[in-house]
UniProtKB/Swiss-Prot annotation:
<feature type="transmembrane region" description="Helical">
    <location>
        <begin position="2"/>
        <end position="21"/>
    </location>
</feature>
<keyword id="KW-0337">GPI-anchor biosynthesis</keyword>
<comment type="function">
    <text>Part of the glycosylphosphatidylinositol-N-acetylglucosaminyltransferase (GPI-GnT) complex that catalyzes the transfer of N-acetylglucosamine from UDP-N-acetylglucosamine to phosphatidylinositol and participates in the first step of GPI biosynthesis. May act by regulating the catalytic subunit PIGA.</text>
</comment>
<comment type="pathway">
    <text>Glycolipid biosynthesis; glycosylphosphatidylinositol-anchor biosynthesis.</text>
</comment>
<dbReference type="GO" id="GO:0005789">
    <property type="term" value="C:endoplasmic reticulum membrane"/>
</dbReference>
<feature type="transmembrane region" description="Helical">
    <location>
        <begin position="45"/>
        <end position="65"/>
    </location>
</feature>
<keyword id="KW-1133">Transmembrane helix</keyword>
<keyword id="KW-0256">Endoplasmic reticulum</keyword>
<comment type="subunit">
    <text>Component of the glycosylphosphatidylinositol-N-acetylglucosaminyltransferase (GPI-GnT) complex composed at least by PIGA, PIGC, PIGH, PIGP, PIGQ, PIGY and DPM2.</text>
</comment>
<feature type="topological domain" description="Lumenal">
    <location>
        <begin position="22"/>
        <end position="44"/>
    </location>
</feature>
<protein>
    <recommendedName>
        <fullName>Phosphatidylinositol N-acetylglucosaminyltransferase subunit Y</fullName>
    </recommendedName>
</protein>
<dbReference type="GO" id="GO:0006506">
    <property type="term" value="P:GPI anchor biosynthetic process"/>
</dbReference>
<feature type="topological domain" description="Cytoplasmic">
    <location>
        <begin position="66"/>
        <end position="71"/>
    </location>
</feature>
<feature type="topological domain" description="Cytoplasmic">
    <location>
        <position position="1"/>
    </location>
</feature>
<dbReference type="InterPro" id="IPR029164">
    <property type="entry name" value="PIG-Y"/>
</dbReference>
<keyword id="KW-0812">Transmembrane</keyword>
<keyword id="KW-0472">Membrane</keyword>
Amino acid sequence: MFFSLPVLTVLIPLVSLTGLLYSASVEEDFPNGCTSTASLCFYSLLLPITLPVYVFFHLWTWMGLKLFRHN
């Protein structure tokens, strides 16, 4: 089952916000516990930044191919 880009654009921040709120309510050392990769808080902060970085570098590569191709 694959989701389209607009659905993922809305779904990923909502899921990560839910995980962040869950981490804030459950974990005792919430701000300091976000550095461990075993923590749900780490991934809820990582997911929203992953998609824009991927889109940026994908477009950067495409522009590089368009502008600097040799005929």
